[in-house]
Amino acid sequence: MLDSAIKDQLKGLFAQLEAHYTFDIFVHPQHESRAELVDSLEEVASCSDKLSCRLQDSEGLKFILLKEGKDTGITFRAVPGGHEFTSLLMAVLNADGKGKNFPDEFITRRIKALQGPISLTTYLSLTCTNCPDVVQALNMMVLLNGQIRHEAVDGSINEEEVERMKVQAVPTVFADGEQIHVGRSSMGDLLEKLEARYGSVELEAVETKEYDVLVAGAGPAGATAAIYSARKGLKVAIIAERIGGQVNETMGIENLISVPQTTGKQLAQDLKKHLAEYHIDILENRRIEKVEVAEGMKVLSVKGGETYKAPVSVSYTHLRAHETVLDL
């Protein structure tokens, strides 16, 4: 059950909804989780007149997110509690064009260029801290590319299927029955794997962008270099697969001076928030494929065809642990 404080927060979140959304529920009358699923979704739906539930008897347990009566392509075969409650909320908000987790224009173009149809399934646990990032990234791809569908499946209530698919860890992602990923991931990494599996429509060439400083890697050191450069009035871009870098893999951090205790995920969020305070282009979900020097400029090429150049590049990547490379 949701307490009054959470309900008030949900009412505030959903107050901005423009379209109407339906949780289209299909569940067996005798399913042990039927009451929990129906009660939880009805409770969420009660927080906005833009949300409703429709219940139908069926085999198993699932619900599909509908927008104005049409299938969005997002399905949950789970009771979205625990860490996946946020995934449910983000699915609704993102379907309405809301949220701060939308990828930038170039990543969006790459997602839209994926050749479908693509059917994705993510096996998860409601206690898994790595699962929501994967679920939310794939749901975002569904909303941006109508050729993609995604099911989020709770292994604890689909044990026979988990055993049949030989799932050993969560999250595990299957693409049309083929396992393509296991464990923590980012949107950029998942996108690369889908591009390799399905191919993409060729994108138009993108003009090389020029900066004063390019920072490769967005851990604490890379973020620091970008912020210090921006404070000097320089035009700066930071390029990384994900903000925070390896920090995201750390559960507890207690050796960051002036901060007695934090988590890797929280520190990564704080780094991104701090970077956003300055005129820094944050180029996330990108893997640098090539670095070269041309006419006195450092040129960085990333997966997907983008190129960037600057007279100065600073590298704080994890290819060689804790190594800093400064090119002047």
Task: Give the positions of each predicted feature.
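N-terminal Rossmann-like dinucleotide/flavin-binding domain of flavoprotein oxidoreductases
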Residues: E32, L37-S40, N248-T307
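Thiol-based oxidoreductase modules, predominantly thioredoxin-like and allied folds used
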Residues: K50-S58, Q147-E159
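Structural micro-motif
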Residues: D57-I74, R164-A175
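Non-catalytic, surface beta->alpha helical segment in thiol-disulfide oxidoreductase systems
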Residues: G69-K98, D176-G199
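Short hydrophobic core segments
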Residues: A216, Y308-L319
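Single conserved hydrophobic/aromatic residue that forms the stacking wall/gate
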Residues: H318-L328
